[in-house]
Structures are given as structure tokens and as C-alpha cells.
Amino acid sequence: MNITIISVGKIKEKYLSDAINEYSKRISRYSKIDIIEVADEKTPENPSEVEKSKILEKEAERILKYLKKDSFLITLEILGKELTSESLAKKINDLSISGKSDITFIIGGSLGLSKNISEISDFKLSFSKMTFPHQLMRVILLEQVYRSFRIINGEPYHK
């Protein structure tokens, strides 16, 4: 299994970097894990719809450069499907059993993801209807991927 996380924006806070490194290390027992950061665009204070669209398209171009043709794409979107931890584990396990050994998760920047990226997504996943900072979302996603592997392998995990 190969897990790739493509995320818009850099992690600036040490405590988030530490958490990302810790969960990446834990996941590496079960799967190869790659985290790719693409640059985010500077967003003006009150961007117009045209400015938002241009920003999202520039970020989408950067994301597209890293997509593998045969990877199963899961985008993180507010309007995606909400899953329990057990359901996410089942989804990852089912993909693995069906021969999809490459899964790519995509986390957008402060404005989310462009329609172009959303349209090519194989599965739209929502963690909540609430908005989270994309840097924190990376930690939350990694924790849930780690938890999924623990569930898949019948290992105990914190409830």
C-alpha cells in the first residue's frame, strides 16, 4: 500500500510538524507514506470571486503535477461524504483488496479545492461541516489513516 498526501501550503508551526512526523512514522509500519506540499497562493484580505477562481486554478496546476495516473484520489471537501473511523478503514482495506494499492489524499488551501480537482476525485471525503486550518487537517487526516491501519490489522486503538 502507498499513501500519498498532497497538501496546499507549508507547515510553519513546530508542534504540527512534530505531530505529522510522529504519525508518518507510525503509518510507515503499514504503508509507504509520502507527503507532498505544494505552494499556496497569497490570498488578498477580501478576494473577489474572480481572484478566488484564479488562486484555486494556480493551486490546482501545482497539485496536478504530482498526481499518479493509477492512484485512487480522495479529496477532502466540506461537502464530501462523512465516514466513521471504521468506515474509512473499510474503504482503505477494500481498495487494497481490489488492487488499488496507491491512494492519494488531497487537502486544499484556505479557499479549498478547484472544481477541476474535485471533478477528478474518486471519492470526496468530509471530516466535518466545519472548516479547519489546512495545516491542522493534515494532522487529523494522518491520525485517521493511522487509526484505519490499526483497525484493519485488528490492533487496539483509542476510542
Swiss-Prot record:
Keyword match Cytoplasm: yes
Bilayer-spanning residue ranges: none
Alphabetized GO MF terms: rRNA (pseudouridine-N3-)-methyltransferase activity
Pfam families, A to Z: SPOUT_MTase
Subcellular location: Cytoplasm
Reactions catalysed according to its record: pseudouridine(1915) in 23S rRNA + S-adenosyl-L-methionine = N(3)-methylpseudouridine(1915) in 23S rRNA + S-adenosyl-L-homocysteine + H(+)
Residue sites binding S-adenosyl-L-methionine per the record: 76, 108, 127-132
HAMAP family noted in UniProt: 23SrRNA_methyltr_H
Name the UniProt record assigns to this protein: Putative ribosomal RNA large subunit methyltransferase H
Originating organism: Methanococcus maripaludis (strain C7 / ATCC BAA-1331)
Source species taxonomy: Archaea, Methanobacteriati, Methanobacteriota, Methanomada group, Methanococci
UniProt gene name: rlmH
